[in-house]
Design a protein with these regions (language model features):
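Nucleic-acid endonuclease domains
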Residues: 1-57, 65, 71, 77-179
Length: 179
């Protein structure tokens, strides 16, 4: 995909300043990734790629590859060199509903590590793909609208390998604690 142009030094002569944050550009990054995959389905070897119908669902796009079942991807962004925080993954109740309707679904978090370049572009430096069901630190934050949060979803070495149904049990327990 290459760097994503956001602005230029004519309209932002002092650079990024306080705008150099993931929350400033995450939606654009999400769209660039989704549309880039959709427009290059065959070229990239996918059977199909479809954007999510809802902007507030648990995934941003779904895809099929090599005749296998459909998989789902939730796109996140993280700033290169940023500190490790508990980040919002999705609303716990929406994830619970999703896994109840799709008990064997492959749902992934694809985190694009981004950098803010002097030429007012966003660099896509790295992509980390992590199965949602493998999140080791399952925590539902009651003071943050019941969001599933994790600080370890960007490190596969910390993964707790489990099936979607095993994850559903853990998530439901964490959600009960949060209520």
């Amino acid at each position: 995909i290459g760097n994503i142009p956001i602005a230029n030094t004519k309209i932002m002569p002092y650079g990024w300043r306080k705008a150099a944050k993931g929350r400033t550009v995450w939606r654009i990054v999400e769209e660039v990734i989704s549309q880039g995959l959709e427009s290059r389905v065959k070229q990239l070897g996918f059977d199909s790629v479809h954007a999510a119908d809802s902007e507030v669902g648990v995934f941003d796009f779904r895809f099929c590859y090599d005749g296998n079942k459909e998989s789902y991807v939730n796109i996140k962004s993280a700033v290169l060199g940023g500190r490790t925080n508990k980040d919002d993954i999705s609303k716990a109740v929406r994830l619970i509903d999703f896994y109840k309707k799709n008990p064997s679904a492959n749902l992934y978090i694809a985190t694009f590590v981004i950098s803010f370049n002097d030429d007012m572009t966003i660099g896509l430096d790295k992509c980390i793909v992590f199965p949602t069901a493998w999140i080791p630190d399952v925590y539902v934050n009651p003071s943050n609208n019941g969001n599933l949060q994790s600080s370890m979803y960007k490190n596969l070495r910390t993964a707790t390998k489990r099936t979607p149904q095993e994850f559903l049990v853990v998530l439901e327990q964490a959600n009960q604690v949060a209520l």
